[in-house]
Amino acid sequence: MISLIVCSRNSTIPISLKKNIEETIGANYELIVVDNSQKKYSIFSAYNEGVKHAKGDLLCFMHEDIIYRNNNWGESLESYFMQYNKVGMVGVAGTHYLPAMPAAWWDTEIRSGQLLQGSVINGEYKVIGKDEWLEYKHIPTLVVSVDGLWMCFRRRLFDLIRWDDISFNGFHGYDTDISLQVWNSGYEVHIFWDVLIEHMSAGNAQLDFYKSLDVLYNKWCNLLPMIKGTEISEGEQTARLRIAELRHELFYSEYKLRNLCASRQYRWGGYLLKPSTIYYRMIKHLKRLLGLT
């Protein structure tokens, strides 16, 4: 049986999602909703609560803003875990290279996976594209870590791992941390290609997200860098590391600019030379280097 575990900002998940699961999973399952409407839990403690109540052989942790877009994915999932004895965890998108610095899984852009990305534009929800990273696709596709919108595990792994609500709080860093725990326990992390998920909202990394990356790096720095599922030369690693560094420099430059423009001194004309112009030029330069313009 598959246990589906959701941390919900409400007392339950939308009826439409329940119906979507029922119509597409194609396997025996139970649904465990951890009610976080009173903001009692971090994502770590909520998922630990879900593990306590789960009865399935496979545990799937999923966001509540997703839609399953293909049928019988649950049956395929059970078959996949039966076929590959070493796999402990699967996801739909992840990285082959995690550098020796605080970094998100997507920062180095050496990725595998697929998902549909949705967004609300001018008050109307629509699918804006399909993210598909196939360059490193093999069967099986090994990765260092996966994205947290959908992750499935063998139940018995939770005798060796747990959602680390001691080192972390809040709602960030949980996916990469648990991925590294799986590798450190002697099991593998794979991309599961036989489910297509539509993610109905795009992530928006803020300061608390980047702080969680610092905690993550301090915890796992002795294992980094880590490469799985492909080979990467030292020169390529250095180049990808620089990409990750530039992404972080860009965020902190934008963060400083936002704080500056919101400051009382700036609004009252305390800065005659308008340092925001300097930050703007810096951000523009970084975006150009990263190919974001």
Task: Pin down the residues of each PLM region.
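Short, well-formed alpha-helical segments that are part of the catalytic scaffolds
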Residues: I2, V6, N10-I25
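Glycine-rich, basic loop-to-helix element that forms the pyrophosphate-binding segment
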Residues: Q38-A54
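Conserved donor NDP-sugar-binding/catalytic core segment of glycosyltransferases
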Residues: K40, I67, N71-L116
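Short aromatic/hydrophobic "clamp" motif used to bind/position activated sugar donors
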Residues: L59
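A recurrent flexible, glycine/aromatic-enriched loop bordering the glycosyltransferase active site
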Residues: I121-F153
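Donor nucleotide-sugar recognition loop
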Residues: S145-V146, R155, D159-L180, Y187-E198
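Active-site donor/metal-binding and catalytic loop motifs
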Residues: L160, S185-K211, V215-K219, S233, ...
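Boundary detector for helix-to-coil junctions that initiate low-complexity/charged tails
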Residues: T230-T293
